[in-house]
């Protein structure tokens, strides 16, 4: 065991070394964008890391115990644009702490308990546009040294200890300031002197947020002749009287957008009535919003008498018990009613209204007709509304409508094809229940429509003309619907300008080969979440602009036989993830294609095998499938193929020989009808008729010869007659050899069959007659015949008295060999049937 002294001698130097190593070198920052963006959050840094590149532009150092920022703390990052120092326990910021950051546009100091802030703490920030100093113990704007930040657009000092709303004189230098957030401070009163700087140097684009300050007094005239872009006062008043008094104190203010109300679950008011907003009559307001008043408002129309001339009116999360007609007295151009509670759907008659947003409301589920002649934008989504008939000009009281959103509602019965609404460009029905969609061309009149969403609308497409008329459509979303027999027909023939098509979750199993032929402009096609079992590329051959094709979450095992040559060259992204790939030898070419196209495929590393079971879950890219059969199986297979091939060749070559063999077996024991079958050339037929037949059949004893012109059966193949009538029914074969014989294919064929016949019958049955001398060069062309004539006895015809006598005596003797006397004799035939027939 190591002694204590030796152990101490080892540990002390190691600890000394570790104490010299900077913590920032132990835990490196996360490189989000190389050389640009680094996240160093919660790495226990006590100082600014210096091991990051000078080119860093975005740096997150939040939740590190930096505590102190000295001069030039960030000199190593001259290109820095965004710096997050949230909750770094910073207590002291010295002069010139950010001196080298001339490009910094955003500085976040949220949650730092700053106690010492030098006058030059923010010097050098010549490009700063956004400063967030939330929860920094800031007690006053007067001592906040930012007067030189002339580029500043947004100042957020919410959740601090500021008690006075007095804007310091240096605000006159902040000419670009657009947003000042003073919410959640301690401001209770606003006096005329607090806003003197805004009288001297008006900030016309300034948005001021004073929410969550416990205000109880605004001096009348404090905001007189002051112009603001936006003023937000939410959760500021603890009673109705205080609210009324403070709103009256805003008299003379000219504001583009005024937001009043409370926050969800943070209400201070016990009651609310129309008197609270009477002071608004003394303000000039362009847009008004009232949010989160959890009270039952009864006479809402009288409540907003002072707001009849605003251009935009908005109610968010307000409960309205009873609504009179929104009549023509209101000059609103935009009306927004969001997440409100109504007793019934309000009756709207507003001649100047151009935009109506009525979403996520409760109560009044039945839509009633409205009269809005100038309406161009209508959002009725997420209300659970039901429409007994939709859609036409009479439903909305306008012919100017361009945008219509009826998504996330109840049952909508399509009873009209948008008559009077021909100007529509955007139409959304998603997640509503559409009825009668496939009974007629619903969209026939919408030739200006650009966007259509009928996703998840319980639509079953059974009518090919469902999209007729949509000649300008560019985006079509119809996910989550169904098709008759799960087959996609040719329903897009008129959508020649379509660029985006979503057919996901439609239970599709097959599609027409010409379904997309007219979509030459299509760029994105989503076919995911369907039931395709193979990747059929043929339907996409005409999509010359296609860039993205999503086939994920299907049941694709392989591609169809036409391979994958039909994918357009423009395709950049193909998603085949989460399919049922069959990783077997049968589909090896498809699996290899996946590997070859990894640059085209999206998340190719997520493509996994589904079958066989031993490869389930294995990435297709890492698959090394071996498609080699057992050598024995290969050998047997090759040998079998060779044997079959040889047998087939032999059968083809010796077909007639086999026929002869079969005949021998069949007629082997039968009687011979003919004494001889005569093989001769048709050119020698005169000699056969006048000499051979006359002398043998009319002589003593008579012999019966088989001759083709006389004894062959009509209608039977020549070869069959030769074999069955000639060889099988004859004792002998007479071969009449001449120059014509040697040059005849049929004669040579008969001669070869005769040799086989002689071999099978086991007797010397061939008698050769050389009718005329044949040139040896010609005879040698038939090797076997030449050999037989050289080795065997044959008869030679001589046209003389003695020669004739000897010839016929020898021939009769040869024919009598093996013949029992029969006065009826035997017969024979000739060879060149084709030659004879053609003559």
UniProtKB/Swiss-Prot annotation:
SMART domains: LRR_SD22, LRR_TYP, LRRCT, TIR. Induction: By LPS in plasmacytoid dendritic cells. Residues 579-629 form the LRRCT domain. GO terms for biological process: astrocyte development; B cell proliferation involved in immune response; cellular response to amyloid-beta; cellular response to lipopolysaccharide; cellular response to lipoteichoic acid; cellular response to mechanical stimulus; cellular response to oxidised low-density lipoprotein particle stimulus; cellular response to platelet-derived growth factor stimulus. Disulfide bonds join 29-40, 281-306, 390-391, 583-609, 585-627. Residues 24-631 are extracellular. Highly expressed in placenta, spleen and peripheral blood leukocytes. Detected in monocytes, macrophages, dendritic cells and several types of T-cells. Expressed in pancreatic cancer cells but not in normal pancreatic cells (at protein level). Residues 672-815 form the TIR domain. Residues 653-839 are cytoplasmic. InterPro entries: Cys-rich_flank_reg_C, Leu-rich_rpt, Leu-rich_rpt_4, Leu-rich_rpt_typical-subtyp, LRR_dom_sf, TIR_dom, Toll-like_receptor, Toll_tir_struct_dom_sf. It is found in: Cell membrane; Early endosome; Cell projection, Ruffle. Glycans are attached at residues 35, 173, 205, 282, 309, 497, 526, 575, 624, 630. The keyword RNA-binding does not apply. Belongs to the lipopolysaccharide (LPS) receptor, a multi-protein complex containing at least CD14, LY96 and TLR4. Binding to bacterial LPS leads to homodimerization. Interacts with LY96 via the extracellular domain. Interacts with MYD88. Interacts (via TIR domains) with TIRAP. Interacts with TICAM2. Interacts with NOX4. Interacts with CNPY3. Interacts with HSP90B1. The interaction with both CNPY3 and HSP90B1 is required for proper folding in the endoplasmic reticulum. Interacts with MAP3K21; this interaction leads to negative regulation of TLR4 signaling. (Microbial infection) In case of infection, interacts with uropathogenic E.coli protein TcpC. The TIR domain mediates interaction with NOX4. Belongs to the Toll-like receptor family. This is Toll-like receptor 4. It comes from Homo sapiens.
């Amino acid at each position: 065991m190591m002694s204590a002294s030796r152990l101490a001698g080892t540990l002390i130097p190691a600890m000394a070394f570790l104490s010299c190593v900077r913590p920032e070198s132990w835990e490196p920052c996360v490189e989000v964008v190389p050389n640009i963006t680094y996240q160093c959050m919660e790495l226990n840094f006590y100082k600014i890391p210096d091991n990051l590149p000078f080119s860093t532009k975005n740096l997150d150092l939040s939740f590190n115990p930096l505590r102190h920022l000295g001069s030039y703390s960030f000199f190593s990052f001259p290109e820095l644009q965004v710096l997050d120092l949230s909750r770094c326990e910073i207590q002291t910021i010295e002069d010139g702490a950010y001196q080298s950051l001339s490009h910094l546009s955003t500085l976040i100091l949220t949650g730092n308990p700053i106690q010492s802030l030098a006058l030059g703490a923010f010097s050098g920030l010549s490009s700063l546009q956004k400063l967030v100093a939330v929860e920094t113990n800031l007690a006053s704007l007067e001592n906040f040294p930012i007067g030189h930040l002339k580029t500043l657009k947004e100042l957020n000092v919410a959740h601090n200890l500021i008690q006075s709303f007095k804007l310091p004189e240096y605000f006159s230098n902040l000419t670009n300031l657009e947003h000042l957030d003073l919410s959640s401070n301690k401001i209770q009163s606003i006096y005329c002197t607090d806003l003197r700087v805004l009288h001297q140097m008006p900030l016309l684009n300034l948005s001021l947020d004073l929410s969550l300050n416990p205000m109880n007094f605004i001096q009348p005239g404090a905001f007189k002749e002051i112009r603001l872009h936006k003023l937000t006062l939410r959760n500021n008043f603890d009673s109705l009287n205080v609210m009324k008094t403070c709103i009256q104190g805003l008299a003379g203010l000219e504001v583009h957008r005024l937001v009043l109300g409370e926050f969800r679950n943070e209400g201070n008011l016990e009651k609310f009535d129309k008197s609270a907003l009477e002071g608004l009559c003394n303000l000039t307001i362009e847009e008004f919003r009232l949010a989160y008043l959890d009270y039952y408002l009864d006479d809402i129309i009288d409540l907003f008498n002072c707001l009849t001339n605003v251009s935009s009116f908005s109610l968010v999360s307000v409960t309205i018990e009873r609504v009179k007609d929104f009549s023509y007295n209101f000059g609103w151009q935009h009306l927004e009613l969001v997440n409100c509670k109504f007793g019934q759907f309000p009756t709207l008659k507003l001649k100047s209204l151009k935009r109506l947003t009525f979403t996520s409301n409760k109560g009044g589920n039945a839509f009633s007709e409205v009269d809005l002649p100038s309406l161009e934008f209508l959002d009725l989504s997420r209300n659970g509304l039901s429409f007994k008939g939709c859609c036409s000009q009479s439903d909305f009281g306008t012919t100017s409508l361009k945008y219509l959103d009826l998504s996330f509602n109840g049952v909508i019965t399509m009873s009209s094809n948008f008559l009077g609404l021909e100007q529509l460009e955007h139409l959304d029905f998603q997640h509503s229940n559409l009825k009668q969609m496939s009974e007629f061309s619903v969209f026939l009149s919408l030739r200006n429509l650009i966007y259509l969403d009928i996703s998840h609308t319980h639509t079953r497409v059974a009518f090919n003309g469902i999209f007729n008329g949509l000649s300008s459509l560019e985006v079509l979303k119809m996910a989550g619907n169904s098709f008759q027999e799960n087959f996609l027909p040719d329903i897009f023939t008129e959508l020649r300008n379509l660029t985006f098509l979503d057919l996901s979750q439609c239970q599709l199993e097959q599609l027409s080969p010409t379904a997309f032929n007219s979509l030459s402009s299509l760029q994105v096609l989503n076919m995911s979440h369907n039931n395709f079992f193979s990747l059929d590329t043929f339907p996409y051959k005409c999509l010359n602009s296609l860039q993205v094709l999503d086939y994920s979450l299907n049941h694709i095992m392989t591609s169809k036989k036409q391979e994958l040559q039909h994918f357009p060259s423009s395709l950049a992204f193909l998603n085949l993830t989460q399919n049922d790939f069959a990783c077997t030898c049968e589909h090896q070419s498809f699996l290899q294609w996946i590997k070859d196209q990894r640059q085209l495929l999206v998340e190719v590393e997520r493509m996994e095998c589904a079958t066989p079971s031993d490869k389930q879950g294995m990435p297709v890219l890492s698959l090394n499938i071996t498609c080699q059969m057992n050598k024995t199986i290969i050998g047997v297979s090759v040998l079998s193929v060779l044997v079959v091939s040889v047998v087939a060749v032999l059968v083809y070559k010796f077909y007639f020989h086999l026929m002869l063999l079969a005949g021998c077996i069949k007629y082997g024991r039968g009687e011979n009808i003919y004494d001889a079958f005569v093989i001769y050339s048709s050119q020698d037929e005169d000699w056969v008729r006048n000499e051979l037949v006359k002398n043998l059949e009319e002589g003593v004893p008579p012999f019966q010869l088989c001759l083709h012109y006389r004894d062959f059966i009509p209608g039977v193949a020549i070869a069959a007659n030769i074999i069955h009538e000639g060889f099988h029914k004859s004792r002998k074969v007479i071969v009449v050899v001449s120059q014509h014989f040697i040059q005849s294919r049929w004669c040579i064929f008969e001669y070869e069959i005769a040799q086989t016949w002689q071999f099978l019958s086991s007797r010397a049955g061939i008698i050769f007659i050389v009718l005329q001398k044949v040139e040896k060069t010609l005879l040698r062309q038939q090797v076997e015949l030449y050999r037989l004539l050289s080795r065997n006895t044959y008869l030679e015809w001589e046209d003389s008295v003695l020669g004739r006598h000897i010839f016929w005596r020898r021939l009769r003797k040869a024919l009598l060999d093996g013949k029992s006397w029969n006065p009826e004799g035997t017969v024979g035939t000739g060879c060149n049937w084709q030659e004879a027939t053609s003559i």
